[in-house]
Amino acid sequence: MTEFTLNAQARTDLGKGASRRLRHSANIPAVVYGGNQDAQSLTILAKEITKLFENEAAFSHVLELNVDGAKQNVVVKALQRHPAKGFIMHADFVRVVAGQKLTAKVPVHFINEEAPVKKGGEISHVESEIEVSCEAKDLPEFIEVDLANAEIGTIIHLSDLKAPKGVEFVALAHGDDKAVANVHAPRVAPEAEGAAE
């Protein structure tokens, strides 16, 4: 696994006003919790966290969070982004404890997409990430979805995917066999249909 490090400082100035002041000073508020320890409020440099999460792999790797010199292993639980501009406004991290399962969202990588397209199909990506449950050592960088044998009308569900060893799909474990992608016939605009007649 690639190692990702993020520096942070503990903060005691809490609330909406404090968070707003942080953002105006090129920092963002964050919190780390779990691991049988109290939640801790943090301050992180906006440019540092933005650079880290430009790398897709950072979302599905154990990160080393350095809080005022004290290092701890964490995974990102959630990033709150500005609705219009997309920049990170807040981050939630969960501490990783060896031997304990964690849940994380892992990106989906679609391969062999050209195969159904050559057969005249169009692909709809229903899910771009999948929530998994596993120990930190088993956390995959991504889940691969192979579309080589997909035909028009194919719907690929979670149950069609092979989970890596030690990894469980959370939705499937709760009886929700979500669709991940489907292949359908091209949609024809009504004007085009009329012109063809």
Swiss-Prot record:
> Which GO CC annotations does the UniProt entry carry?
cytosolic large ribosomal subunit
What's a GO biological-process term for it? translation
Q: Identify a single GO molecular function assigned to this protein.
A: structural constituent of ribosome
Q: What UniProt keywords apply to this chain's record, in alphabetical order?
A: Ribonucleoprotein, Ribosomal protein, RNA-binding, rRNA-binding
Q: Does the keyword Cell inner membrane apply?
A: no
Q: InterPro entries under this entry?
A: Rbsml_bL25/Gln-tRNA_synth_N, Ribosomal_bL25/Gln-tRNA_synth, Ribosomal_bL25_b-dom, Ribosomal_bL25_C, Ribosomal_bL25_long, Ribosomal_bL25_short, Ribosomal_L25_dom, Ribosomal_uL5_bac-type
Which Pfam families does the UniProt record give? Ribosomal_L25p, Ribosomal_TL5_C
| HAMAP family in the cross-refs | Ribosomal_bL25, Ribosomal_bL25_CTC
Give a short account of what the protein does: This is one of the proteins that binds to the 5S RNA in the ribosome where it forms part of the central protuberance.
Q: How does it assemble?
A: Part of the 50S ribosomal subunit; part of the 5S rRNA/L5/L18/L25 subcomplex. Contacts the 5S rRNA. Binds to the 5S rRNA independently of L5 and L18.
Family statement: Belongs to the bacterial ribosomal protein bL25 family. CTC subfamily.
User: Which protein are we looking at?
Assistant: Large ribosomal subunit protein bL25
- Organism name: Pseudomonas putida (strain ATCC 47054 / DSM 6125 / CFBP 8728 / NCIMB 11950 / KT2440)
The organism's taxonomy opens as: Bacteria, Pseudomonadati, Pseudomonadota, Gammaproteobacteria, Pseudomonadales
